[in-house]
Amino acid sequence: MGDVEKGKKVFVQKCAQCHTVENGGKHKVGPNLWGLFGRKTGQAPGFSYTDANKSKGIVWBEZTLMEYLENPKKYIPGTKMIFAGIKKKGERADLIAYLKSATS
């Protein structure tokens, strides 16, 4: 498992421009991530997803996020997430640790 504090820095640098994490937070370019773990792709209430996200049908957990965050467009072809991904596994683990603590 990753380091929550390092993960928060990764989130601020690479994710916060498009995503919020707090309960009741607004959608930005990307959906609010509150309740992410255990939720199916394309299911954040009130966010307009692509058909690709809605039909992917996986449940977000450490394993699926680890793969998705490495290369989002490869994992969900047709996603509108315009982010190249995080190549370093340790950095992804830190981000996932932060997301797990911040979104539930």
UniProtKB/Swiss-Prot annotation:
Binds 1 heme c group covalently per subunit. Heme c binds at residues 15, 18-19, 81. The modification N-acetylglycine is found at residue 2. Pfam families: Cytochrom_C (PF00034). It comes from Cyprinus carpio (Common carp). Belongs to the cytochrome c family. InterPro entries: Cyt_c-like_dom, Cyt_c-like_dom_sf, Cyt_c_1A/1B. It is found in: Mitochondrion intermembrane space. This is Cytochrome c iso-1/iso-2.
